[in-house]
């Protein structure tokens, strides 16, 4: 089943059509342009409910359901994007070969990265700067919803990460107010399984 989805995602990418799919952890449909596909994750230029580009999302191929190509409302969406002068300046150079490579490349290109652990913690996300990635875990210096950096970074299991977002309006607003974090002291690093 995942292989059939990959074929359809590659079709969406090569034909530059808007994809629409349902994701079991979100309410409603997700819409966007598929920009690249890796072994596990694919890169999507997200089109939000206001018919505007709103950053990028990397979803697990195995998590998407009811993929529609093209989006049944593609003509309307394309016309609205055009009228609003919405465009993607360029595809970000995100390495999708593995989750650690994805996280490192997104962290290098964008000021903040959002991770989701939708199976373990539905409805929650964690936003911050990647400090370190090991074979099994991610060390993330997190920022709270008030744009205040936590004093200690948190560790997350890579196996629990189901989605990675970056370049969206919310991440940009947090960075605008919170700025860059001060480097944490090694002795204060929080551990998370």
Roles of regions detected by a PLM:
Residues 34-50:
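N-terminal beta-strand/beta-hairpin edge segment
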Residues 41-44, 136-140:
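Short aromatic-glycine-enriched beta-strand elements
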Residues 28-36, 125-132:
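Short beta-strand-centered aromatic/proline hotspots
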């Amino acid at each position: 089943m995942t292989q059939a989805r990959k074929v359809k995602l590659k079709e969406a990418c090569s034909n530059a059509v808007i994809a629409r799919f349902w994701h079991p952890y979100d309410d409603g449909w997700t819409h966007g342009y598929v920009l690249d596909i890796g072994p596990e994750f694919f890169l999507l230029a997200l089109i939000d409910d206001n018919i505007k580009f709103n950053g990028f999302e990397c979803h697990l191929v195995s998590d998407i359901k009811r993929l529609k190509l093209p989006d049944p409302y593609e003509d309307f969406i394309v016309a609205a994007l055009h009228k609003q002068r919405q465009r993607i300046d360029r595809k970000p150079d995100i390495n999708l070969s593995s989750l650690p490579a994805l996280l490192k490349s997104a962290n290098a290109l964008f000021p903040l990265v959002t991770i989701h652990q939708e199976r373990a913690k539905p409805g929650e996300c964690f936003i911050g700067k990647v400090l370190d990635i090991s074979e099994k875990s991610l060390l993330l210096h997190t920022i709270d919803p008030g744009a205040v950096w936590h004093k200690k970074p948190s560790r997350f299991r890579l196996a629990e990460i189901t989605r990675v977002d970056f370049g969206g309006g919310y991440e940009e607003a947090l960075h605008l107010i919170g700025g860059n974090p001060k480097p944490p002291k090694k002795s204060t690093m929080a551990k998370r399984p």
